[in-house]
């Protein structure tokens, strides 16, 4: 009797046989260039197109792997299965022109029964409600619908309840998407490099979107960072994902250059505030502890970036009054600096950490003044001036304690820049085009692109050598998205091989007595990530790629049947009694079979071949044909090769 996994693989081969005549290339109708799909794009497209009953799929692909191109290829060729399709595409407003309209235009799909819904636009969502009623009233055998959700984690974050007693306004939209996607013969294609960003509850919503009512996933299904009743869950959720990663490493780990993808090097810059900035931080600390928003560390985060004489509290002021106060403070700061610019001689002294003894007293005075307000901005300027190429700088704060004052520092240091934020909506796409041009390959025309959260997803930069993260986001997934703006497939191909790297700089500010909101946020990020990593590993195991590679030569089925059975069979409640007992372990060096360049420290249970890190089972050793664990020697270390704990 075959396992469900084997039967699913036979269905994949049925789909591949059915779609064997689909072209692997697609024509760019603007440039007449022939675009060749990557093997993974072609494989997943054919399986999703060829299996009518595989109605939902998540493209869990790293940034830069071509999710948009693959989606449009699927749209173009679904007519192989059925001639009449209507497409509803959910996206962020900032992704409408690029990549979506541009990709659709290039591939000859613009305007062909396509409706965009901007999930961060209230007017667009109202239009979707009208569209939904029209679709529901007219669903018939003559039309089918493909729903595409780009950055699906954004939709889930807008849906998920903030507490057990509250529901989000977006929930009704979410439920309508689920109903449409699971109407007979319709399909759903979701996309994200980081489908789970904050907690396990997001996985519950993701399952309810892709395969609704099959299980009510709970956080306590993960015990000691191990997924309970893994096989039951695997059989019920099998093949809801396609999984492609540059590396299994997290955002804080160095990665080597691989074909098409730049290497990543992590640097931490610990900087100390001046006594003046430290004093304002302590005032902000007291304010945050009293404030209802203190848990968000709001005021401390602001003054860690820029502290000008006092903290800016809105209090009972109206928004107009508050904006006026902030504007006055900004003008006051500008008046202190005026149009001052450092000389090239002073910039060289600063860049090289040379003594200021030979610098002009007027320049030293200005330098001491601006350093007094922000140790972070000073460090960012030094990183930029020492960079050999173009620089991205992420700063989510747009107004006073953020981009507005940062740009003044850049002007003083004669650093050229463009801005991509909510305040530059009319010009930002043009700015990115200029920044990415070949004649700016090394930043000789425009050195820096400052971008806020508006540019943290969806947009692409080319030939970046340094990223500065000035203010940390709350989630590791957001950091991954930020880094992913610059490390994309072929993003560095115009640079020589030795320049195909990205240095990622985290600037961590502390007061003179060691207080640091940046360190607090780092600790919070890392504490959230363990359970998310368990689910990410699970999604790899149930992916199309894992199953197909295991049973690549399985005989195709004659007709589809398995996915309707799976979708309508509820997974039994997961056994609550799985517990982890104490075990004896030994220190070990290991690496993943997917990337032999990154070596980790762990602890091995010799009885089971399972490796642990921080009491978490994270990998298991691989046996060769002689039943001996695979290993190699590197730098006098015995390094064992491992695979996922769930394989």
UniProtKB/Swiss-Prot annotation:
Gene Ontology process terms (BP): DNA-templated transcription
GO MF annotation, one: ATP binding
UniProt xrefs under Gene3D superfamilies: P-loop containing nucleotide triphosphate hydrolases
Superkingdom in the source lineage: Viruses
Motif (DEXH box): 150-153
Localization, UniProt: Virion
Keyword tags: ATP-binding, DNA-binding, Hydrolase, Nucleotide-binding, Transcription, Virion
Domain Helicase ATP-binding span(s) in chain numbering: 48-213
EC number(s) recorded for this UniProt protein: 3.6.1.15
Enzyme class, broadest EC rank: hydrolase
Role played: DNA-dependent ATPase required for providing the needed energy to achieve the termination of early transcripts. Acts in concert with the RAP94 subunit of the virion RNA polymerase and the capping enzyme/VTF to catalyze release of UUUUUNU-containing nascent RNA from the elongation complex. NPH-I must bind ssDNA in order to exhibit ATPase activity.
The protein's name in its UniProt record: Nucleoside triphosphatase I
């Amino acid at each position: 009797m075959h396992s469900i996994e084997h039967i699913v693989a036979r269905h994949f081969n049925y789909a591949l046989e059915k779609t064997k005549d689909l072209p692997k290339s697609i024509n760019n109708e603007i440039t007449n260039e022939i675009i060749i799909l990557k093997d993974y794009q072609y494989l997943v497209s054919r399986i999703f197109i060829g299996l009518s009953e595989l109605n939902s799929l998540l493209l869990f692909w790293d940034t830069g792997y071509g999710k948009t191109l693959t989606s449009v290829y699927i749209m173009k060729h679904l007519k192989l299965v059925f001639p009449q399709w209507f497409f509803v595409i959910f996206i962020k407003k900032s992704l409408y022109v690029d990549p979506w309209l541009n990709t659709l235009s290039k591939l000859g799909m613009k305007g062909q029964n396509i409706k965009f819904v901007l999930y961060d636009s209230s007017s667009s969502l109202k239009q979707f409600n009208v569209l939904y009623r029209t679709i529901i009233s007219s669903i018939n055998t003559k039309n089918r619908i493909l729903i595409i959700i780009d950055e699906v984690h954004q939709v889930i974050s807008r849906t998920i309840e903030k507490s057990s007693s509250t529901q989000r306004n977006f929930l009704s939209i979410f439920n309508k998407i689920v109903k449409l996607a699971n109407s007979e013969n319709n399909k759903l294609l979701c996309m994200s490099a980081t489908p789970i960003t904050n907690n396990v509850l997001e996985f519950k919503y993701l399952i309810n979107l892709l395969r609704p009512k099959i299980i009510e996933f709970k956080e306590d299904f993960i015990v000691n960072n191990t997924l309970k009743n893994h096989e039951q869950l695997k059989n019920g959720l099998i093949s809801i994902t396609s999984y492609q990663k540059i590396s299994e490493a997290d955002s804080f780990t160095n990665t080597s250059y691989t074909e098409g993808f730049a290497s990543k090097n992590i640097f931490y810059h610990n900087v100390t505030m001046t006594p003046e900035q430290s004093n304002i931080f302590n005032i902000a600390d007291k304010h945050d502890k009293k404030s209802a928003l203190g848990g968000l560390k709001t005021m401390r985060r602001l003054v860690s970036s820029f502290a000008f004489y006092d903290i800016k509290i809105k209090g009972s002021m109206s928004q107009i009054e508050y904006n006026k106060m902030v504007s006055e403070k900004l003008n006051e700061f500008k008046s202190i600096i005026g149009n001052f610019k450092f000389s090239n001689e002073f910039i060289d002294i600063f860049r090289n950490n040379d003594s200021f003894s030979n610098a002009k007293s007027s320049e030293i005075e200005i330098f001491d003044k601006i350093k007094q307000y922000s140790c972070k901005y000073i460090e960012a300027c030094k990183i930029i001036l020492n960079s050999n190429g173009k620089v991205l700088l992420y700063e989510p704060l747009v107004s006073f304690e953020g981009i507005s004052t940062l740009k003044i520092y850049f002007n003083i240091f004669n650093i050229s820049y463009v801005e991509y934020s909510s305040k530059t909506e009319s010009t930002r796409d043009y700015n990115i085009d200029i920044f990415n041009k070949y004649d700016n390959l090394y930043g000789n025309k425009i050195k820096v692109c400052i971008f806020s959260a508006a540019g943290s997803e969806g947009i692409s930069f080319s030939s970046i050598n340094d990223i500065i993260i000035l203010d940390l986001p709350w989630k590791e997934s957001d950091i991954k998205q930020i880094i992913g703006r610059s490390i994309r497939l072929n993003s560095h191909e115009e640079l020589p091989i030795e320049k195909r790297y990205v240095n990622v700089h985290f600037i961590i500010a502390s007061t003179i007595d060691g207080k640091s909101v940046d360190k607090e946020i780092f600790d919070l990020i890392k504490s959230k990530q363990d359970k998310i990593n368990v689910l990410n590993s699970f999604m790899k195991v149930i992916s199309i790629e894992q199953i197909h590679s295991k049973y690549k030569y399985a005989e195709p089925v004659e007709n589809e049947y398995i996915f309707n059975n799976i979708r309508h069979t509820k997974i039994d409640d997961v056994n609550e009694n799985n517990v982890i007992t104490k075990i004896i372990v030994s220190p070990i060096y290991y690496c993943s079979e997917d990337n032999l360049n990154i070596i980790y420290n762990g602890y091995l249970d010799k009885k089971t071949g399972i490796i642990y890190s921080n009491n978490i089972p994270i990998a298991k050793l691989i046996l060769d044909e002689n039943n001996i664990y695979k290993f190699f020697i590197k730098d006098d270390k015995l390094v064992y090769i491992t695979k996922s704990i769930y394989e």
